[in-house]
């Protein structure tokens, strides 16, 4: 026996009410909680999938985890023990090199080296980071984890009938959010514009920032006119107006749109060389980082460096993780000391979520 053990359990998350996106309506989502134990210490991570968006084949997650568990049981974890001895209690101002070391360990374990299982790789990265902190779920210690700083976040408005969306908008405004993100593309575009017009009648751009996310719902043919129409509401940006893998069409939109465009789905599944090529071809105003969909913090951080080199803005978004994954993503986000609202969830979506020490007050996410 190596003294190293990987275990997991599937625990699908149940939505309090159906969650509508342009890809359909979700009532539950597949989730696995993983645990990595070595020499009496344990670390936890989460495999979080979004059906129709995540690359990881849902039906193969259990098999991949079983294969990895067998490999790890048979392996003498010399490298991991050395890593934990050298990095345990490390100064996380050097978090990039810590993540690089973890990436090397995951590569040696053959975890999604072909990019087919980014969410699974993220879960193992999380578990290794948690091991470093002694299993305290303090993936990245900072003034955020100490409760000294908070992260500005947007309030998310789910798709649905106009009355349901209006109800959500009023609730988020009452909670003190200074930035709202509306998912659009599921109902009639005129009705969505009427909703935006109604918000703007009451709140100026200085009082309330509005972002919209089309999840690729527009076509290259109708997108220019729709972007022009949306721009009259003085929006901050629109996420993924057309579906991914249409680089020339998206590049034309980014060059000519009166509204800033943020790429989201466009980042999923691209290898190292493709990432630079895509950013150079499309030249978006922003990119959005979702670690579960990109293979974890190491790869998401590489995207950020590429964006910064090109003068492209970014923000970080959770992707329907449980409170475990959300906490890790929030801690990583805090390292970048964001001043603009991030797209971090608040753990309120599910009937069976894990306990959390995070809370939102006045549009700021922090340790409660």
Curated annotation (Swiss-Prot):
GO BP: amino acid catabolic process; menaquinone biosynthetic process; phylloquinone biosynthetic process
Listed pathway(s): Quinol/quinone metabolism; 1,4-dihydroxy-2-naphthoate biosynthesis; 1,4-dihydroxy-2-naphthoate from chorismate: step 4/7; Cofactor biosynthesis; phylloquinone biosynthesis
**What's the EC number here?**
4.2.1.113
Q: Which parts of the chain span the membrane according to its record? A: none
Reaction catalysis annotation: (1R,6R)-6-hydroxy-2-succinyl-cyclohexa-2,4-diene-1-carboxylate = 2-succinylbenzoate + H2O
Asked whether the UniProt record includes Protease among its keywords, one would answer no
Which keywords, in A-to-Z order, does the entry hold?
A: Lyase, Magnesium, Menaquinone biosynthesis, Metal-binding
Q: Does the entry feature the keyword Metal-binding, yes or no?
A: yes
* Signal peptide bounds: none
**Entry annotation: catalytic residues:** 183, 290
**One Pfam short name:** MR_MLE_C
Q: Name one GO molecular function term.
A: lyase activity
Q: Where does Mg(2+) bind?
A: 213, 239, 264
Cofactor(s) this protein cannot do without:
a divalent metal cation
Tell me, what does this protein do in biology? Converts 2-succinyl-6-hydroxy-2,4-cyclohexadiene-1-carboxylate (SHCHC) to 2-succinylbenzoate (OSB). Does not show N-succinylamino acid racemase (NSAR) activity with N-succinyl-L-phenylglycine as substrate.
Recorded family membership? Belongs to the mandelate racemase/muconate lactonizing enzyme family. MenC type 1 subfamily.
Quaternary structure annotation from Swiss-Prot or TrEMBL? Monomer.
The record's PANTHER family line, in alphabetical order, gives: O-SUCCINYLBENZOATE SYNTHASE (PTHR48073:SF2), O-SUCCINYLBENZOATE SYNTHASE-RELATED (PTHR48073)
Question: What's the protein called, per UniProt?
Answer: o-succinylbenzoate synthase
Q: Which organism is it from?
A: Desulfotalea psychrophila (strain LSv54 / DSM 12343)
